[in-house]
Amino acid sequence: MGYARPKPERLAEKLGQIRIALGLSQTEMHRRLGAEEMIAYTQISKYESGRREPSLMILLQYARVAGVHMEALVDDDLDLPKKLPGPVKYGEINRAYVSRSRNKKR
């Protein structure tokens, strides 16, 4: 059997950090994610408050917009970089270095 990763407890916090670090409103973040046809813009607020969990496709878009590897979003032991690299250009591999959280929440 495969290993099931526990639900990330810091995901909502990290999604909000990304939007704020990029200086975007929730509506602008919705557009930047390219999610107009997948979700309503009001879902961004629900993701950031932890009331809803984004789909894999939306998580991939958040990682792309922020320029970080998706693992930085879903692994509670990893922090986002202090400065987000920004969107990854097509064909470019860009993995942001992340630091292990000193305050593990377990």
Locate predicted features:
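Hydrophobic micro-packing sites on short alpha-helices
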Residues: 29, 58-63, 73-74
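Short, basic-rich loop-to-helix N-cap that marks the start of a DNA-contacting helix
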Residues: 41-42, 49-64, 80
